[in-house]
Amino acid sequence: MKRRLVLENGAVFEGEAFGSLEHNMGEVVFNTGMTGYQEILSDPSYCGQIVTLTYPLIGNYGINRDDFESITPFVKGLIIKELCELPSNWRSAYTLDEYLKMKNIPGLQGIDTRKLTRMIRTAGALKGTFASSDEDIEAVLKRLNETELPRNQVSQVSAKTAYPSPGRGKRIVLVDFGMKHGILRELNKRKCDVIVVPYNITAEEVLQLKPDGIMLSNGPGDPKDVPEAIEMIKGVLGKVPLFGICLGHQLFALACGANTEKMKFGHRGSNHPVKELATGKVALTSQNHGYTVSSISKTELEVTHIAINDDTIEGLKHKTLPAFTVQYHPEASPGPEDANHLFDRFIEMIETTEKEGEAVCQNA
C-alpha cells in the first residue's frame, strides 16, 4: 500500500506503508546510527517525533524482548529506505513490521532518505504528517499547518508515581523526565539504591528521601517547558551531589542562570565525537537532542566538553558545588560506551563530598 510523507514546506515523499495505518503528525528528524533501531523506537526522548533512519537497510535483526529503553514507545512514526522482512538473530521475537503494528506506529519505506535528510539539514527540523496516496495534498498541508504540535512532552513520558529499584549502595534519586532504562541499568550495575521519581517532584520532597546523590535523566522537548523542574534543581543544588544527562543537562544549566536554544536539526546518532577540554581526549558518544545550552555567561558554570563537529556545549560543571552534567548519553543504548565511566565519576563525587562533610563535622 502506498503512503506519503507531507512536510510543512510542501515537499512530498511517496513510498510503501508498513507498520500501522495511522496518519500521525510530528516533528521529522533524522538519526545517523547504523544499528540500534529498537532502542531508538523505545527512547522517550523521541516523543512526538517522526524518525528518519539514514542507514539504508533496517530490521535486519528484528525486535527482541531485552533491548527496550521504555515499556511504551512514544515515537510518532518511522521512515526508512528499505525494510528487512526476514530478520536473522537468535534473540529476535518479532519483525520490525510486526512490532510497529502492535504499538500502532506507522512506517514508510522506499523513499529517498538521503534527500529527506539533506532537506532537514538545510531547512531545519520540519513538521510532517503521513497521508494516503489518494489524499489531496493541499488539504493535507492545510491540516498540517493549522495543527500545533504538543509541548511539554515530559509530562507525557515521566513516571506518574515514585518507585524503587533497590540496591545496597548509594541512595540515588533519579528524576524521570523521560528516562531511558539504560541509565537505571548503569546505576544498578553499581549497586545503587535507586528511587525513580516524577518530573514534577519538589525540592523538599526530593530531600525528604535523604539521597546521597541526584540524577537528572534525559527526556524530550524544550527544557523551558518544564519550569517546575528548574525550580526543583535550584532547591537541591549544593545540598546533594548532582549528575545530569541530556535534558537533565539543559535543565541544570537553566537553573544556574544559563540559556538554551533550539538547534537547526539537532544531534541524533551514535557516532558524535566529543572533546574533554581538561584532557584533550575525544570520545565517540550517543546523542539525541534538539536543544542545546547556548550561553553560560554570568554563571558559576564551566564548560567541560564540546562537540567536535560544531563546537556546541556538551558538558558542564559547577565551579564550587558538586554538580556536573553532559549533553550526550554515557549509558549509550545504543552506541559506544566511551563515556560509561561518568557513572563511576558520579559515585566518586558522592563519596568525596561525604568525606569532606565528615571532615567539616570533625573540625567543628
UniProtKB/Swiss-Prot annotation:
Residue intervals of the Glutamine amidotransferase type-1 domain: 171-356
Entries under Gene3D superfamilies matching the protein: 3.40.50.880, Carbamoyl-phosphate synthase small subunit, N-terminal domain
Domain of life where this protein originates: Bacteria
SMART domains: CPSase_sm_chain
Keywords, alphabetical: ATP-binding, Glutamine amidotransferase, Ligase, Nucleotide-binding, Pyrimidine biosynthesis
Keyword Cytoplasm: no
Residue sites binding L-glutamine per the record: 45, 219, 221, 247, 250, 288, 290-291
Biological process annotations from GO: 'de novo' pyrimidine nucleobase biosynthetic process; 'de novo' UMP biosynthetic process; glutamine metabolic process; L-arginine biosynthetic process
Enzyme class: ligase
Active-site annotation: 246 (nucleophile), 329, 331
One of the record's GO cellular component terms: carbamoyl-phosphate synthase complex
Pathway assigned in UniProt: Pyrimidine metabolism; UMP biosynthesis via de novo pathway; (S)-dihydroorotate from bicarbonate: step 1/3
Reaction(s) catalysed (UniProt annotation): hydrogencarbonate + L-glutamine + 2 ATP + H2O = carbamoyl phosphate + L-glutamate + 2 ADP + phosphate + 2 H(+)
GO molecular function, one term: carbamoyl-phosphate synthase (glutamine-hydrolyzing) activity
Assembly with partners or alone: Composed of two chains; the small (or glutamine) chain promotes the hydrolysis of glutamine to ammonia, which is used by the large (or ammonia) chain to synthesize carbamoyl phosphate. Tetramer of heterodimers (alpha,beta)4. Interacts with BrxC.
Function comment: Small subunit of the glutamine-dependent carbamoyl phosphate synthetase (CPSase). CPSase catalyzes the formation of carbamoyl phosphate from the ammonia moiety of glutamine, carbonate, and phosphate donated by ATP, constituting the first step of the biosynthetic pathway leading to arginine and/or urea. The small subunit (glutamine amidotransferase) binds and cleaves glutamine to supply the large subunit with the substrate ammonia.
Protein name: Carbamoyl phosphate synthase pyrimidine-specific small chain
Organism encoding this protein: Bacillus subtilis (strain 168)
